[in-house]
Regions:
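Conserved acidic residues
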Residues: 52
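Active-site catalytic loop in hydrolytic enzyme cores
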Residues: 1-49, 62-71, 75, 141-144
Length: 155
């Protein structure tokens, strides 16, 4: 981070080789983890796979959490027009002999990017009712997926 502290998750963990969705009733869920939120295209791919809600269990450091956590999750919600349910560890724990402190602040964001539930510092939880009508309205009123696909952008 900008304060000189660092943590490189990729030194300990490898990437998966496929995107995952599952069904609960009539709702398609997209599954990601912590570092995945830095890849907007992954969230768009989950949307194309039918995701309406994307889960993001995470373990963000204090610095990256403070600077990136909420803004990135809200951005992924807006871009994908999916609900984002981000559960985050909080506090300190031992990892390979060193104490690591993590940010917490679990949250739920709607497809418009509004944070509709948020945990504060400390232990706690955030809950929200996922409303499919909100998803349908946002996607109807601003059909970004169809517009994006129609443009066939290549950089």
């Amino acid at each position: 981070g900008p304060d000189g502290t660092g943590y490189r998750e990729s030194a300990l963990y490898g990437a998966g080789d496929k995107l995952v969705t599952c069904q609960i009733g009539d709702v398609t869920l997209g599954l990601t983890i912590c570092y995945d939120m830095r890849f907007a295209e992954q969230y768009m791919a989950l949307r194309r796979m039918g995701a309406e809600v994307i889960f993001v269990p995470s373990n963000f450091t204090l610095q990256t959490g403070k600077d990136h956590w909420e803004v990135m999750l809200r951005s992924r919600a807006i871009e994908s027009q999916c609900w984002i349910a981000a559960a985050a560890s909080w506090g300190g724990y031992d990892e390979r002999g060193a104490t690591r402190f993590v940010y917490g602040h679990s949250l739920v964001a709607d497809p418009w990017g509004h944070v509709v539930a948020k945990a504060s510092d400390g232990q706690g939880w955030a809950t929200a009712r996922i409303d499919p009508a909100v998803t349908a309205r946002v996607r109807r009123d601003m059909p970004v997926l169809e517009h994006r696909d129609a443009r066939r952008l290549s950089l």
